[in-house]
């Protein structure tokens, strides 16, 4: 590939590997004279910096506490005075807390004022302070000193601004701090009288001291060498700030760039887990118990044999183990370790820290952690499995995370297939998977929660390469189900440790130095020995905040009386609301969803409810805007300052993701739902919960969120939240309109690589609508009509209209085609094949008429051909692949060097041609040479590599190099198995081709090869059966059934060709009957392939004759004397039974077609050193070995006139071969009876449907030469798509046909009964 492409890929890979942390500078200035600058930066410069950060996968958010917005007590309502006093008393502490949380980023603006300060410290006596809320704005430095900043008392005369600068720049050092000094002697904005009145009494001496102080402060900043900029107006300030912080962004994120229109959900998910691990690391308290747990986990992860528990620790014994944990001692190989504790015992923190520990100690080991509940997507079982798959394949193949192989295959959205891919992925190389909190897993897309949590989907045995570490609570369904598995080792953590460990946990989270009354708190803790780490963490965090405005000992006493974690959370929520919140009085009678008299408690309660009900979390500005919508405005407005105080108090529990969205850090905060929403059932449990009267409040919040996100301009935020709330509130009509709207379709269709989460939820929401009676095709076709009629042409100005208000403007032909093609592709996936075909053809028409010969035309023609191919219209499909080939030739190879998508499209065209084109076409157009050139342009994507090997295998076979073709196909099979497992149709495709290659040239084939063919055919049948049950389109199900019939016949033919013993014949008969059943059901009696029934039954009659002779009373002597005759007679009918398909195309995709001279060339090549032995060209049996004679479609057409005389000599035998794997249990007489009865019913039904008294049989063609054992290698290969097809017709009596069928069935049953009696 070109150097430019390689550079882009390298930069992209660096972006994926490096977490992008947000940039959040703290804004510092004197309070009253920089409001204009703050507003200018917030409205003009910071949004630009945020856009720049977005291009690097992160965000920019300045933290401006805006104390000037806090109104004086006299202007506040009486019931708000308490909140004002509490906030005012902790002003300095709050500022210093945020300086620390924003470190290392800091922006400071200084002018000619110094800010409020105490000129005479002697009047400030902290010992006389009785009510903290009564302190002045300056005197509240006592609160800061008591809560972590004792150094402020050493400098009591400093202003608030200088305190912030000391904390940011003098007590800490950072290269990301910038100071902006305003020049001039006048302020940009005059101070109003009210603000002047808040200042301390002014005098000339005070003004002089203030001027002196600000001068000294600036001199200290400059002398320390901190970066200082000077500005004279707003424009100059904006330029300086943008230039400085653009450099910061580029310095922190070098050489990383997000590719436009790529869905980066997986990358962000990955960062979230890393961030979660880092936060847990900060809270971990190391103890002897944690060290011993680490050792157990490490030994389990590294060893393939049972742990020697006597050596868990050098100084430990088994007697001491139960003090901390209990281990299931079953002495068998274990692949799963289940760590269990009750809620709040620190499992997640312990595991996250072990992950950090293990990665540092064993950096070469592949360890992938996943913490359920860390994001909204992390709880869905399919997202969890997909996350593991993507990470494993990225580590093994280097595939780009957002363009992984599953994004190219709709099978990846089927749960059973996804599990198969997962099993294949963990078998690639040694790996350690960590899944924390499995009791929180939930189902989606038709997967029930019970199935998810009981782990019935997980195979009974995992690959020995994989070690799986899980954690859950002991009372969960997951724990009970996994304990029943023999490959699970359980480690139950039953103790937090000794008393000192508990106190260390408490101290860790309290983190307040010089706290004198701490010992009194520890005495209270010692009286409660059953405190879990979660309770200790809650108590410590609450004590830090509660003690500012309350009696801390009363707080401790009240909290310790709580019996459960939920009761404790209810007390905490009550305290939060009392200290930080207020409500307002206006009636809400307009609400059509809230019951009469039902009010909202307070803004804190409302904010927590909104956060709880959101799908992916909410940003701070979103929450503040939502509160404004709920009525908190004017005097009741929740300012950024009020919000900052609340967030500072709850930062341990309401945390921020790397993308800036807030979420509940611990699952125990579900108490919010129970306490504030009055809901017992989890949010995700039922989309119909809105119908329950007791959930009216919950439904109301969902509707508020709907109204809010309908007005938003960010597509990803709208797509993540709006459809979710529409579903949860029962607004299904709106959901249908949203998903099918041209605007949303336009956004989604522009994404180059639609991520797994995006596709999964789109399909999930449509499934909800389908269950409610909505028609997906009707909704989308209405949008198509609007697109064609140019009814979406409203002008959009960036950032001024919401996503739903946007209209597509001046759609070009290519735009319309892109939209319609996306809709067609989605309808095809949803099983609406006819509508998809119509749209594809319409798009092709539009592109051809507009002479837009772009890569889109290539993509559309390829899609049409694939649709035809999948529904059995092979010839029509081939015509479109020819068109795609012509379009492809218009693109030079140099055009492909910078377009990975174009290379993929060309690979798909070649793949489809190999499946549908004739041998002559492939040779005349030099497809093999072109495929060789394309293969040199492929990247390291294993899916594309496997497809190319398949193409080369087919083309090399056509060229006559059978041995090399087999080698390529085996390579393709191995890659696809490692990618998709054993049940994917792509695996079945190449497996059947290989089986055909190995089966048809049966001369002196080895026994092992015959077994391999049998195994392949049976596996292909299972794959097709599974695919048929999951297919959404009736046309696709029909074609899969017909294809299954072909494979069943192939298997029967292989069985009969390999062996003629009794049980093999019985099994083959079952496959043949089932093949007939499938054809009668899906094709009807008039289809040409149905006429092969007579040929099959003619073969069955011969089988019955052999079996009846074999079991004469004379026994084995009779059988021995007839052995030679039996083998010859069976082979005589077997070789006369041509292998045809219901298809009418002349292809070489999954089987072989060569005439005699081609076969001779292939045979000569087989004798070469690098080729396979020509023993594989003959089918041995108990008698004389006979070749299988086959002829091409062209030869069949040429011999039309000869077919009538040969009709009885064999029609359905190759079809019989295709009945590969009905079941090995077909030997059961009961099943045989049912099968025969079913076949009889199908034939009678076919008779009634046809309205005729005869069945026409088309089959047999004369053999091109006499069958002779002297020419064992002169057989031909033919395509699977030729099975059951011939152009000739002849009529036979339906009555005699049925009589013979009944006669054979009766004899088979009689013989089987005799055998059972013996």
Curated annotation (Swiss-Prot):
<keyword id="KW-0802">TPR repeat</keyword>
<keyword id="KW-0963">Cytoplasm</keyword>
<dbReference type="GO" id="GO:0005737">
    <property type="term" value="C:cytoplasm"/>
</dbReference>
<feature type="repeat" description="TPR 3">
    <location>
        <begin position="817"/>
        <end position="850"/>
    </location>
</feature>
<dbReference type="InterPro" id="IPR051191">
    <property type="entry name" value="DCAF12"/>
</dbReference>
<dbReference type="InterPro" id="IPR027417">
    <property type="entry name" value="P-loop_NTPase"/>
</dbReference>
<feature type="repeat" description="TPR 6">
    <location>
        <begin position="1045"/>
        <end position="1082"/>
    </location>
</feature>
<dbReference type="InterPro" id="IPR011990">
    <property type="entry name" value="TPR-like_helical_dom_sf"/>
</dbReference>
<feature type="repeat" description="TPR 4">
    <location>
        <begin position="858"/>
        <end position="891"/>
    </location>
</feature>
<feature type="repeat" description="TPR 5">
    <location>
        <begin position="991"/>
        <end position="1027"/>
    </location>
</feature>
<feature type="repeat" description="TPR 1">
    <location>
        <begin position="399"/>
        <end position="432"/>
    </location>
</feature>
<protein>
    <recommendedName>
        <fullName>Putative tetratricopeptide repeat protein 41</fullName>
    </recommendedName>
</protein>
<feature type="repeat" description="TPR 2">
    <location>
        <begin position="653"/>
        <end position="684"/>
    </location>
</feature>
<keyword id="KW-0677">Repeat</keyword>
